[in-house]
A protein has these predicted regions:
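Hydrophobic, helix-rich cores of sensory/ligand-binding and other regulatory modules
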Residues: 1-123
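Basic, amphipathic alpha-helical hairpins
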Residues: 103-106, 124-134, 143-154
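Append "Primarily bacterial transcriptional regulators
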Residues: 157-166
């Protein structure tokens, strides 16, 4: 029964609506990719890109929970960005855990907004100070070994043994 009060959806309009959604999703993913690349380079201007990417979605009705979820996603994206910059997981995990706890501790939505810039800048600084992307894998391994074993008596022989080189 076709009624003028409740017309059936027109397939063309459904496709248009789906296309609009698909385009918006593709733009969001592209924005996330650009943001992650900028953070991996340690580019502090990346903080200006955040609002364009992940923080505009409405996934759940509870506004605070929705924003916290989006900030957790942001934290995860930033973590993956600096991982791509060859930052050791030890350093990534420390910052990721710090932000996860701070995000969950927030009780008012407005308190989250200043964090977005802080989160991105924190990860940018991590990429600037701890990225080993410019080193060959064996040099990265050696540097990591030295960083994590400074309190031990480190010798050239111990490093060579650890890395399996002579």
């Amino acid at each position: 029964d076709i009624s003028s009060e409740d017309p059936s959806p027109c397939p063309v309009f459904e496709e248009d609506s789906m296309q609009v959604r698909a385009d918006a999703i593709a733009r969001r993913y592209e924005g996330e990719r650009r943001l992650m690349e900028a953070v991996a380079r340690g580019d502090m201007r990346a903080a200006d890109m955040v609002e364009e990417t992940t923080l505009r979605l409405e996934r759940v009705p509870n506004k605070l929970r929705n924003r916290k979820n989006l900030f957790i996603v942001l934290n995860t994206l930033m973590r993956k960005a600096v991982e791509a910059a060859q930052v050791h997981p030890f350093y990534i995990d420390a910052i990721s855990a710090k932000w996860a706890m701070r995000i969950e501790a927030v009780e008012q939505e407005a308190d989250l907004y200043p964090m977005r810039r802080e989160i991105v800048e924190d990860y940018c600084r991590l990429a600037q100070t701890r990225s080993m992307a410019s080193y060959f894998p064996n040099v990265r391994s050696m540097l990591t070994y030295v960083q994590f074993n400074l309190a031990e008596g480190i010798s050239l022989e111990a490093i060579a043994r650890q890395l399996g080189v002579n």
